[in-house]
Amino acid sequence: MSIMQVEVVSSEQKIYSGEATFIVVPTVQGELGIYPRHEPIMSLVRLGALRLTVLGEDKEVLVAVSGGVLEVQPDKVTVLADVAVRSAEMDQARAEEAKKAAEAGISQAKDDKALAEAHKALAAAIAQLKTLDYIRSHKK
């Protein structure tokens, strides 16, 4: 079975680095499924659930992403995400609370920097909620 190297990195940390047999990335054009030896492309990442199929793993590795850039080479996929969180680190109640706090931050922003930070936090919370919804809807 063919494999490819995958790197998922946020501005704060490396989220995933390893091999995968398939990856689905939410892009501005829609979800993009990538197998090893894919044609080289670049795309903008939109918020949603990034899904990795790892050889020998029963479940997909799920990462909530909100924005960023995708680079695909035949043997390597790199995702530079604005915000990325592994599904194991997510919690529904915390994500909902973060969404409410970000929405309040948007309405109370005093300047452009505060507004941008609140929008980034809102996107991260929505990405986590979408990923948690995906997990719930695909439980076996």
Swiss-Prot record:
Keywords: ATP synthesis, Cell inner membrane, Cell membrane, CF(1), Hydrogen ion transport, Ion transport, Membrane, Transport. It comes from Neisseria meningitidis serogroup A / serotype 4A (strain DSM 15465 / Z2491). Gene3D superfamilies: F0F1 ATP synthase delta/epsilon subunit, N-terminal (2.60.15.10). InterPro entries: ATP_F1_dsu/esu_C_sf (IPR036794), ATP_synth_F1_dsu/esu (IPR001469), ATP_synth_F1_dsu/esu_N (IPR020546), ATP_synth_F1_esu_C (IPR020547), ATPsynth_dsu/esu_N (IPR036771). It is a peripheral membrane protein. The lineage of its organism: Bacteria, Pseudomonadati, Pseudomonadota, Betaproteobacteria, Neisseriales. One of its GO terms (molecular function) is proton-transporting ATP synthase activity, rotational mechanism. F-type ATPases have 2 components, CF(1) - the catalytic core - and CF(0) - the membrane proton channel. CF(1) has five subunits: alpha(3), beta(3), gamma(1), delta(1), epsilon(1). CF(0) has three main subunits: a, b and c. One of its GO terms (cellular component) is plasma membrane. Belongs to the ATPase epsilon chain family. It holds the Pfam family ATP-synt_DE. Produces ATP from ADP in the presence of a proton gradient across the membrane. Its main location: membrane. It is found in: Cell inner membrane. This is ATP synthase epsilon chain. Disulfide bonds: none annotated.
